[in-house]
């Protein structure tokens, strides 16, 4: 049947065209191209290999490939938790002139909450499917510490934090206003996302679907830290932050629509402004 043929052609496409596997220091290491761009987005790489997790126990080579993606993602986070896309090595790239703290290992440095959530989702599901906890080593612990620090900085309770981004461009959605800080927010417990999963700049910086993704991802991280690492203090930090963001979402992320009643806004700023829309890529309101 044509549908079977379509599946046979499409399902292995990521393996055939974007996955680059090697071992580094004796451990699996997988660099995943995002489409035709020779760079690895944390979000896209996590989504591209996601369908293969269910088959990991049936194919040892596939399992090693997945382990390599997860290990590579942890390394990337520890290079720079604010970056969304990375090079295969310190080779520089097209966006080195962006006005932000660029490094040669980075392809792009757009701060997007979901970039730190997709690796947690992938690692958690891999662990649940395979029972392999070897990935949760010191690199993992450091990645979690960096994720927590970054999320807390971008709650902006103690100033605007270290992240700024500007690009010389004719496209407004590829840069941030307000001297690279983006629109002001009221620090109510939500996390700022300077850019959306589409890589477009947010209008109001509390991106609601991505804050929900942060809540679920932090809870998954806490479970791993408790069960595997026995690191209850770090797990509690994850749980506490998840609860704080979840509470803030209930209070600030909804809008009383005159026709549809209570709905979630796509973006808010904590001052009472709401952006009612949705955007391509996941997480989105529709995808929730």
Task: Give residue spans per PLM region.
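Active-site-flanking structural segment that lines cofactor/substrate pockets
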Residues: 7-43
């Amino acid at each position: 049947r044509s549908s079977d043929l379509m599946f046979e052609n499409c399902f292995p496409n990521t393996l055939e065209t974007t996955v680059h596997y090697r071992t580094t220091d004796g451990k699996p290491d997988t660099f995943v191209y995002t489409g035709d761009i020779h760079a690895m987005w944390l979000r896209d790489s996590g989504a591209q290999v996601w369908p293969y997790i269910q088959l990991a126990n049936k194919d040892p080579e596939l399992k090693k490939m997945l382990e390599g993606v997860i290990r590579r993602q942890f390394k990337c986070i520890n290079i720079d938790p604010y970056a969304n896309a990375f090079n295969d090595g310190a080779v520089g790239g097209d966006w080195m002139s962006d006005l932000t703290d660029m490094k040669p290992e980075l392809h792009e440095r757009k701060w997007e909450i979901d970039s730190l959530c997709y690796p947690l989702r992938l690692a958690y599901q891999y662990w649940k499917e395979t029972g392999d906890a070897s990935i949760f080593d010191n690199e993992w612990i450091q990645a979690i510490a960096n994720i927590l620090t970054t999320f807390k900085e971008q709650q902006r309770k103690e100033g605007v934090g270290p992240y700024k981004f500007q690009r010389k461009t004719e496209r407004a959605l590829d840069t941030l206003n307000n001297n690279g800080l983006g629109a002001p927010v009221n620090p109510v417990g939500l996390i700022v996302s300077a850019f959306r999963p589409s890589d477009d700049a947010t209008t109001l910086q509390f991106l609601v679907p991505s804050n929900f993704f942060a809540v679920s991802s932090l809870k998954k991280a806490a479970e791993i830290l408790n069960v595997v690492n026995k690191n209850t203090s770090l797990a509690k930090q994850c749980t506490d932050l998840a609860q704080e963001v979840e509470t803030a979402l209930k209070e600030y992320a909804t809008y009383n629509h005159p026709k549809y009643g209570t709905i979630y806004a796509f973006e808010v700023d904590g001052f009472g402004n709401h952006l009612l829309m949705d955007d391509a890529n996941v997480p989105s309101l529709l995808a929730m």
